[in-house]
Amino acid sequence: MSKNLLLIFTRNPELGKVKTRLAKSIGNDKALKVYIELLNQTKRFTENLPCDKIVYYSENINCKDIWDLHTYRKELQSGNDLGNRMANAFKQGFSEAYDKIIIIGSDLYDLTSDIILEAFERLDSNDVVLGPATDGGYYLLGMKELIPSIFRNKEWGTASVFSSTLKDIADKKVFLTKELNDIDVVTDMENHPVLNSFL
């Protein structure tokens, strides 16, 4: 067992339930195809990372999807909002004696294994690692112990999440990774020829 754990939060890829903001512009069918490609990309840059990995599903666990059971453990998200679900996943990980835990989503095409590896390394000398997203949220969060305030009193999915989180950890030593753009609306896809092929 590694002492490092990567949590990957996903939505079950079901028509009409993923990338709903994107779907308003390109329709549910294409939005689903884009999300499936984002899931595949997430698998590509995480599968060879030297850490333990858990995929957290939003609705139900699929034992026969792209996530290989030899590489990824599978769990179901639990909680009444995103903050609660993430907090519960971190709690579970720390209860299993992991030293460093990082959580990512599954809607970034530009996230790389190197960014995640650096985030784990930076936790040696920092309390928190945070990856800012261009929309005002964050795409990566890493900790060595649970900091409950991070997950409370947030307007999840809005542009205030990143700045609000920084206020919660003002007394902690924080490292920020490079800013990345998650894929939520059509303009987010402009620099990605692979994703543009779905338009």
Question: Where does each model-flagged region fall?
Answer:
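Acidic donor-binding segment of Leloir-type glycosyltransferases
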Residues: 50-72
